[in-house]
Regions:
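Small-residue-rich segments of transmembrane alpha-helices in multi-pass membrane proteins
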Residues: 77-88, 125-138, 226-234, 253-260, ...
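Long hydrophobic alpha-helical segments that form multi-pass transmembrane helix bundles
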Residues: 117-203
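Alpha-helical transmembrane segments in multi-pass membrane proteins
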Residues: 24-32, 47-59, 77-82, 86, ...
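Loop-to-transmembrane alpha-helix initiation sites
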Residues: 120, 124, 245-253, 275, ...
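Structural signature of hydrophobic alpha-helical transmembrane segments
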Residues: 41-54, 92-101, 185-199, 242-254
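A generic, well-ordered mixed alpha/beta core segment in the N-terminal half of proteins
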Residues: 77-151
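N-terminal signal-anchor module of multipass membrane proteins
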Residues: 1-56
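C-terminal ends of transmembrane helices
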Residues: 9, 57-69, 106-117, 204-213, ...
Length: 306
């Protein structure tokens, strides 16, 4: 009698292995990482390097000494978690806070559930939200673009979403004139976390993932379409208070979340209909949090809630 073998997700039904898909996502992230390095210089390099190394080391230690199993770092998932965590952080974040975030991301968000396939939340987002709650001051300092040799001493400025939130709150000195031009939002000439700076670079990554069939269009398109439509409705209701819908797509973690985080195999639906509903609710929640919540950005919370 044949045995029924039960194993945790992700269950890959194509010819691609988990490892090949992980490394394909790493390749897709390369343009955005390059833009962040060009935009923030030394700070971006330190954040990404520390995040990746800390995530890989944390997984290796837990696997070897706690689970007493062969190392799993070769599958690329720890590297990807480290890269995604780093892309969700400001370039001025002290290295020791990055290490704490990596330990939480891998130790709590992934390995506490048994490792890859068992986790119910995206590990990088678990680490990011933990740091946002534990170290709100450091996590909301946004260095200006172009300070290539600065790290923790970089001159900071408000992000586009921070300016929009300030306008909604009636903060003196905040105006729509301070918002970067659309071209700057596309190419990355503004402040923010490493993964916020260039929508165009992230869209290039999306094209690669779709071409390689690593992901399907359902989740990214449903997130972006819902955010655009709902953001547009709110802009029509009060254009002086709520930004235009294109602004919602090009700022914050909208592109990074829609393309690289909400599409996580383990924590997203498998059916096309489920993915469309899942994406639509993430897009709706993100705009609701941005416009009516206490945080300027809502993508991380929306994905974790869903």
């Amino acid at each position: 009698m044949d045995r029924l073998i039960i194993s945790p997700s992700p269950h890959i039904h194509s010819g691609d292995s988990v490892e090949r898909n992980m490394y394909a996502v790493l390749i897709a992230l390369a343009p955005a990482c390059l833009v962040s390095l060009v935009t923030f210089g030394l700070g971006a390099f330190i954040v990404l390097a520390v995040s990746v190394l800390a995530c890989v080391l944390t997984e290796w230690v837990i696997t070897k000494y706690l689970y007493k199993q062969p190392s799993t770092i070769g599958d690329g998932s720890a590297i990807l978690t480290g890269l995604l965590l780093g892309m969700n952080l400001p370039s001025s974040l002290p290295w020791w806070i990055i290490v704490i975030g990596a330990i939480v991301a891998i130790g709590v968000g992934k390995m506490s559930f048994g490792g890859l396939g068992g986790n119910i939340f995206n590990p990088a987002l678990v680490g990011r939200v933990f740091l946002l709650i534990a170290y709100p001051a450091q996590m909301t300092l946004w260095p200006k673009a172009g300070q290539y040799l600065s790290y923790t001493d970089a001159v900071t400025s408000a992000t586009p979403l921070g300016i929009a939130k300030g306008i909604q709150a009636g903060t003196p000195g905040m105006s729509w004139d301070q918002i970067p031009a659309t071209s700057d939002l596309l190419f990355g000439i503004h402040g923010g976390s490493l993964g916020e700076v260039s929508a165009l670079a992230l869209l290039l990554g999306l094209g690669f993932l779709l071409y390689r069939r690593v992901i399907t269009w359902h989740i990214p398109v449903s997130i972006l379409a819902t955010a655009f439509v709902f953001g547009g409705i709110m802009h029509l209701v009060n254009p002086a208070l709520y930004p235009a819908p294109l602004f919602q797509l090009l700022t914050g973690g909208m592109m990074l979340g829609a393309i690289f985080m909400a599409t996580d195999y383990v924590t997203s639906p498998m059916s096309a209909r489920g993915q469309l509903l899942y994406g639509a609710l993430i897009g709706l929640l993100t705009i609701l949090i941005r416009l009516f919540g206490s945080y300027p950005e809502g993508m991380s919370f929306a994905i974790l809630i869903m």
